[in-house]
UniProtKB/Swiss-Prot annotation:
Gene3D superfamilies, per database record: Urease metallochaperone UreE, N-terminal domain (2.60.260.20), UreE, C-terminal domain (3.30.70.790)
UniProt record similarity statement: Belongs to the UreE family.
Compartments in which it is found: Cytoplasm
Record bears the keyword Cytoplasm: yes
Highest taxon of source: Bacteria
Gene Ontology CC annotations of this record: cytoplasm
Provenance organism: Deinococcus radiodurans (strain ATCC 13939 / DSM 20539 / JCM 16871 / CCUG 27074 / LMG 4051 / NBRC 15346 / NCIMB 9279 / VKM B-1422 / R1)
Name assigned to this protein: Urease accessory protein UreE
Record HAMAP family: UreE
Keywords, comma-separated and alphabetical: Chaperone, Cytoplasm, Nickel, Nickel insertion
Pfam families: UreE_N (PF02814)
Function: Involved in urease metallocenter assembly. Binds nickel. Probably functions as a nickel donor during metallocenter assembly.
A single BP term in Gene Ontology: protein folding
Primary location: cytoplasm
Amino acid sequence: MTRLTGLRRPLLPIAGAKQAPEQAIDGPQVEVPLTAVDRRRVRRRLHAPDGAELQLAFPTGTVLSPGTVLGTRGGVSYVVSAAPEDVAVVVPRTLAEAAHTAHAVGNLHRDFVEDAGAFLTPWDAPIELLLTRLGVPFTRETRPFHGRPSWEHEG
């Protein structure tokens, strides 16, 4: 019999990843556009659109969601926004087609995120091939993506 006591990690994933602490925004703000991949890189330096250099040092595992305050300098708050990136925009014709497509995309360990009546997933060659084989209507667009990057899979 296998013993499951003393595990360092929980056996089942905990709902939701660590989120950066919420801070009140007071005064002017500068949006710092970050892609889904960049929003997972929480220990680094980056340059804001106004030229300010920000040094990030959030705890490992933190997810920088849009609206997270990265820091404040001289009364200006630097806030995360979702940068436009290459995505497949899928518009299934039926609920059954949506479920079948979501299942197939999930088998490739990709997020399938609802956005304004369509579904988005990061664009790459395997996704293009899959969607073409399924015969589901899709287009390639540049839009903000709020899911996880294609290489990250929970479980």
